[in-house]
From Swiss-Prot:
Gene: argJ
Residues annotated as transmembrane: none
Family under the similarity heading: Belongs to the ArgJ family.
GO biological process annotation, one example: ornithine biosynthetic process
Record site: Cleavage: 185-186
InterPro entries (alphabetical): Arg_biosynth_ArgJ, ArgJ-like_dom_sf, ArgJ_beta_C
Localization: Cytoplasm
Active site annotation, chain numbering: 186
Name the UniProt record assigns to this protein: Arginine biosynthesis bifunctional protein ArgJ
Annotated site residues (Involved in the stabilization of negative charge on the oxyanion by the formation of the oxyanion hole) in this chain: 112-113
Keywords: Acyltransferase, Amino-acid biosynthesis, Arginine biosynthesis, Autocatalytic cleavage, Cytoplasm, Multifunctional enzyme, Transferase
Function: Catalyzes two activities which are involved in the cyclic version of arginine biosynthesis: the synthesis of N-acetylglutamate from glutamate and acetyl-CoA as the acetyl donor, and of ornithine by transacetylation between N(2)-acetylornithine and glutamate.
Subunit structure: Heterotetramer of two alpha and two beta chains.
Length: 402
C-alpha cells in the first residue's frame, strides 16, 4: 500500500491552478484513461443536482461505459446555475475532447465548490491547454490537490497486488470535508485500475465497494448536489476466479478514502468508528452503525469526551432496525458499558481519558474513537465512520460564502 506516486499502467493525471479559486491553489484536474476503458459511476441521490451529474450519467449509459477522460474543477459547484451550468459543462468537455483528440461523449466533468455560482469558464477554458500538457508530468498528487475545497488534507492511495505473476495497481483520490452523509456523501472520488473487467461485472464491484465505504460515512447529515464516485478500469483481463482479489483491492481503496473523508470532517478532532456485530444482516448492521455516526448528540459527546452511552443507544434505536435491548452489549474502546442491556460497572474517568487521548492522537493512527455494539441476534456485522462535531464546524460553515 502506498500514498505515493505509483499509478495504474496506462492512466495519466494532471492538476493545475487555473484561477478558479481566490486562493490561487490548484483547482483544475484531469484524468486520461487508455482506449476501450470501462467506466462505472454512482451519483448523488438528491433531486437537486448539478448539470454535470446528469451529463455524466447520460454519457456513461449512452457509451456503455466507454469513457476516456474526466475533467474536475473545484471552487464552483456549477449547481443551480440554470442553462449556464449546462452550457459551461458541454463547452468544457468539448474543448477537452478536441485537445485530446477523442470523442466529446467520452469526456465526463465533475464540479465542486459553492452552490449557485457558475464556473469561471474563461479561466477554465484558457487553462485547458496547460492542463493537457501537464498529463506528461502524470502527477496523481497534483490531481488530488486540485479537487479540494474545505479539505485540510489531500486524500489519495495506491495499492499493489500480484495476480498470476502480474503486478496490478489500483489508485484512488477523493475530496470531502463538509456536507457528508451516507448514500453518496458530499464528495468526489475517482478510482482507476489496470485490469480489464467487463461492464456488468465492474458495475457490481463498484456498487459493493461503495456500499461498504462512501455510503457508510457521515460528517454532518447533509447531502450535496454534486456527489460522484467514478471508477475506470483498463488493461488485460484476468481469469474470473481472481476477480474477488480485485474486489478486495477496490474495497481497501474505497474504505481508506472514505475514512480519510470522515476524519477530515470540518473542525473534526478524531475519527469515529462504529462496529455493529451480531445482526441479522449486513444491511441491518450498517444502518444501525450509520445512525450512531450521524447523531449530532453522539458526535458532540465525543467532542466533549463525555461517555454518554444513552445517546449511543438512543441513536441505534432510531435506525429503524428491530433489536432487543436486553441482548445488547456496548463497548467504548475496550470498556464494556452495557452487558445484556444493563449498565456494567466501569470507570467513567478512564473512558473519558481514552476519548481525550484519541482526540489528541496521531492522525488516522491513534485518533480513532471506537464504539462496538453487539446485538447478539445474528451472525452479521457492519461498520460506519464519522467524526466528532465541534465549535470549529459551526465557525467554518457560518462563514463559508462570506
Amino acid at each position: 500500500m502506498s500514498d505515493g506516486e505509483e499509478k495504474p499502467d496506462g492512466f495519466s493525471f494532471a492538476g493545475i491552478a487555473a484561477g478558479l479559486k481566490d486562493s490561487n491553489k490548484k483547482d483544475l484536474a484531469l484524468i486520461l484513461a487508455p482506449e476501450n476503458s470501462i467506466c462505472s459511476g454512482l451519483f448523488t441521490q438528491s433531486i437537486v443536482r448539478a448539470s454535470c451529474v446528469d451529463i455524466c450519467e447520460q454519457r456513461i449509459k449512452k457509451s456503455s461505459g466507454l469513457i476516456r477522460a474526466i475533467l474536475i474543477n473545484s471552487g464552483q459547484a456549477n449547481a443551480c446555475t440554470g442553462d449556464y451550468g449546462i452550457q459551461h459543462t458541454l463547452f468544457a468537455t468539448k474543448e477537452v475532447s478536441q485537445l485530446l483528440g477523442i470523442n466529446e461523449e467520452e469526456v465526463l466533468m465533475c464540479s465542486t465548490g459553492v452552490i449557485g455560482i457558475p464556473i469561471q469558464i474563461k479561466n477554465l477554458i484558457d487553462n485547458l491547454p496547460n492542463l493537457v500538457k501537464e498529463l506528461k508530468t502524470n502527477s496523481l498528487q497534483n490531481a488530488a490537490e486540485a479537487i479540494l475545497t474545505t479539505d485540510l488534507v489531500d486524500k489519495k492511495i495506491t495499492i499493489e497486488t500480484f495476480i498470476e505473476g502480474r503486478k496490478v495497481k489500483i489508485s484512488g483520490f477523493a475530496k470531502g470535508s463538509g456536507m457528508i452523509y451516507p448514500n453518496m456523501a458530499t464528495m468526489l472520488a475517482f478510482l482507476t485500475c489496470d485490469v480489464g473487467v467487463d461492464k456488468e461485472e465492474w458495475d457490481k464491484m463498484i456498487s459493493i465497494a461503495v456500499k461498504k465505504s462512501f455510503n457508510a460515512i457521515s460528517v454532518d447529515g447533509e447531502t450535496s448536489t454534486n456527489d460522484a464516485f467514478i471508477g475506470i478500469n483498463s488493461g488485460k483481463k484476468i481469469d474470473k476466479k481472481f476477480l474477488s482479489k480485485i474486489q478486495s483491492g477496490i474495497d481497501i481503496v474505497c474504505q481508506s478514502l472514505a475514512k480519510n473523508i470522515a476524519r477530515d470532517g470540518e473542525g473534526a478532532n478524531c475519527l469515529l468508528e462504529v462496529l455493529v456485530e451480531g445482526a441479522k444482516s449486513n444491511s441491518d448492521a450498517i444502518k444501525i452503525a450509520k445512525s450512531i455516526c450521524n447523531s449530532s448528540l453522539v458526535k458532540t459527546a465525543i467532542n466533549g469526551c463525555d461517555p454518554n452511552w444513552g445517546r449511543i443507544i438512543s441513536a441505534a434505536g432510531n435506525s429503524g432496525i428491530d433489536f432487543k435491548l436486553d441482548f445488547l452489549d456496548l463497548y467504548i474502546g475496550d470498556f464494556q458499558i452495557l452487558k445484556k442491556g444493563k449498565l456494567n460497572k466501569y470507570d467513567s474517568k478512564k473512558v473519558a481519558n481514552y476519548m481525550q487521548t484519541r482526540m489528541n492522537g496521531k492522525y488516522l493512527v491513534e485518533d480513532i474513537v471506537s464504539i462496538s455494539l453487539h446485538l447478539n441476534s445474528g451472525s452479521e456485522k457492519g461498520t460506519a465512520w464519522g467524526c466528532d462535531l465541534s465549535k470549529k464546524y459551526v465557525e467554518i460553515n457560518s462563514e463559508y460564502t462570506t
